[in-house]
Amino acid sequence: MKNLTPRQAQILKAIINEYIAYAIPVGSKLLTKKYFKNLSGGTLRNEMAALEKKGFLKKNHISSGRVPSQIGYQYYVKVLNVSNTTNDLKTRLRSVILQQHKTIDEVIELGVKFINEIINLPVVLTNFSSDEVLKKIDLIILDKSFALFLLVSASGKVFKKTISYANQRQFEDIVICVRIFNDRIIDTRFSEINNQLEVLKEIIRTKVHEYQYVIDEILFKLFDLDQIEANKKIYGIQYLAKQPEFANQEKLTKILNLLEDTSVWQQMAFINQTNQKTNIVFGDQLGFKEISVASTLINTTSEAKHQLAIVGPTRMDYQKIKALLTTLKEEIEKYDKKIHNQT
């Protein structure tokens, strides 16, 4: 990444702060009036042209002003300086977390809701629980065509799976499978179930009427570990529609699909596991150029991991978001150690 002079860095930061706040291309006139009263408009235009030439800014087609490029945002993220406003938010977040004694999951949810209300962007909370142990499988008949499987873990988490059936023979196969599962894989870690499925298939083959139906509709869907391992909640999804970048229905639909894509959050978890801090991933790495994702992984004394990810337009307030996520990670891990030492 090319170096900037101190003045160019300050001009870039001012432009990005303005664009984050108002989503309007920034011109030299505004910069002179609001940020650099000691600089002439000509000097600012020259510096902005230099920033554009270096790839940090780009021109807007419908305005004479400039907007940040992805290179500009990446530089901005690397040279963040925490402001007094951000310090105040961090203090408020700490008070929310520590205001009363709660479980780790409850404290995380309190922190997520606080961040969600402050930044007005969706927050994705993903709990990775591949080390959960299966304790029970229950079956609930919904109607003549659908049944609901309830997979209950040792920690009390319940994973729900809806299975369809077309006739009495398929329904009988569902009942047979539940009996076999409860006999054979109870007290097994979810991450180890797939290793036992090959043995189960041979047992099931001799018991059921429609073996291929069982494979496709029950085994494939019931033990989809991507869904079980990544238990996901999305907070504040309504804020997306308020962002001008997502006013187009097609773009909004695309980002909503991204939020529901479990593989994306597993990819983010790998990045966070490798680099134990708050990470910023720009949209071109996820196949969607107009977004960014800020995320962090919270490690607790239990083997479950909690990932927080904030999804927004490329112009989102990285300074504030990064500070809040980092603070939440540090405070939750500190709180977890404290309550663990008390037990």
From Swiss-Prot:
This is Heat-inducible transcription repressor HrcA. It holds the Pfam family HrcA. NCBIfam families: hrcA (TIGR00331). The gene is hrcA. It comes from the Bacteria. Keywords: Repressor, Stress response, Transcription, Transcription regulation. One of its GO terms (biological process) is negative regulation of DNA-templated transcription. The keyword Cytoplasm does not apply. HAMAP family: HrcA (MF_00081). Belongs to the HrcA family. GO terms for molecular function: DNA binding. The keyword Cytoplasm does not apply. Negative regulator of class I heat shock genes (grpE-dnaK-dnaJ and groELS operons). Prevents heat-shock induction of these operons.
